[in-house]
């Protein structure tokens, strides 16, 4: 019986002990799967992120261009385009005139390249001179001497402008008689508005202006008469216009009136001011149609 009994008591494993070697903390299978799933999702997010995408990471980022500014802020002159923006018409004209005076070749290029002034633009400039003249006239009663010396400077400026603009609209520079006559009509109206002083010595500016404009009228009328035999002058009413100007000037446009009489005199003496209007229109219509002076048929043939 002693043989059957072991001298040492048997050792039974404790129910809390694991006979296999394992970590001290056991992990739940569900928790492990959750961790593995989160890690897989994290890996997928990293794969789909823009930073890990090879197509996007290889493309350089486009940034808006910025104006390069100097780090050093110092005073400097305006650029030419900005400077020109600050100049009005008078200042810009003065700068251009000085530049052309210093460099005549530039002035010639300006003369060739600039568009020809229209009649309206030229008369507008002359009207501005006339306004300055009227503004210089003193208010109230004053002596002729005082008035003359007050308006002398703007008066001479207007006369000089008339002398410069008038040749621009005379033949052969201007080939259209209507354009020339339109300018002369407006210029003559300005001369009518020049002041009249009692002393004859102060009237020489206006007298000289009338003489110059009368010769200009005569030149244009003579050239126009060569083309249409004076018919265009009469049909356009320029003979009537000149007659009114001559009356308003006190007969100072005699040279122009003589040229007009020579150009339209073949129509009959006093055709523009005398005679039956219906008869005159009949003659003009026959002239325009080419039937004036044609033989008249007599008899049945």
From Swiss-Prot:
UniProt GO molecular function: proteasome binding
Family that this chain belongs to: Belongs to the cut8/STS1 family.
GO biological process, one term: nuclear protein quality control by the ubiquitin-proteasome system
Ranges in coiled-coil conformation: none
Subunit relationships: Binds the proteasome.
Main localization category: cytoplasm
Protein name: Tethering factor for nuclear proteasome STS1
Gene that encodes it: STS1
